[in-house]
Amino acid sequence: MSKNYYITTPIYYPSAKPHMGHAYSSIIADFFARFKKIDGYNVYFLTGTDEHGLKIQRSAEKLDKDPKEFCDEISKTFEDLTKTLNLSNNDFIRTTEDRHKVSVQNLWNILENNKQIYLSKYSGWYSVSDEAFYNEDEVEEKDGSKVSMSSGSIVEWVEEESFFFKLSEWEKPLLDFYEQNKNFILPESRRNEVISFVKSGLKDLSVSRKTFSWGVKVPTDDNHVVYVWLDALTNYLSSLKYPCLLYTSDAADE
């Protein structure tokens, strides 16, 4: 029986049309997908677009367009790129699709039912373009605005109610898993980097937003939308028909 091999590109953020960097990532993934097929593996190759969030909402507003209309137009250019490059992908997923929404909300319910999610408040410096929060020592004053020292992007002070994932509880289980599965992260230099990061201490992760509406609604509180950490990342499961997992009878071996 052939082993299963699952390979993905990052799902691309369609705030603008694709450029050479998107082609570069896609071609590398396609190379490995084709090589593994030749090597006898049952390959599933995924690419797609991450279409939710404040950045998309604001980009659409600037053009006086509905966010879905904006995403439909830009996402098509990414899907067209897969044909231009003659990629061998099995699927092109969009996080605005119903199949993805079902997966995200199912995963949310599992986490909430297992007491891995709680409601609290978050405050900090937020960059819309980076979709990231920064600590006080990571921002500086420049030309009258606060900016991220690492990216140079303008940041805004944000205070809001948010649901949090108890990531801090997973520090030891993750380290144990990495120790028992030494080839899980490759190359070794990256494995060491990840282990060092986890050992430095994990903080609970903000996984919802109330300050914008363009996203998958939290199933138990429609005042919140699911944030990127649980929305976009779940695409790697939703393409495999999670929670049904109908694509194959067993999980990917690699």
Which ranges hold each PLM region?
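Structured secondary-structure scaffolds
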Residues: 2-47, 99-103, 147-249
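Alpha-helix boundary/capping detector
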Residues: 62, 108, 137-138, 204
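Cys/His-rich short segments
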Residues: 116-163
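A short, hydrophobic C-terminal helix/tail in secreted or cell-surface proteins
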Residues: 250-254
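Short clusters of hydrophobic/aromatic residues that line enzyme substrate/ligand-binding pockets
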Residues: 56, 60, 127, 134, ...
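Short acidic, glycine/serine/threonine-rich loops at helix termini
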Residues: 57-58, 104-105, 130-132, 138-140, ...
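N-terminal Rossmann-like or analogous alpha/beta NTP/dinucleotide-binding catalytic cores
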Residues: 2-119
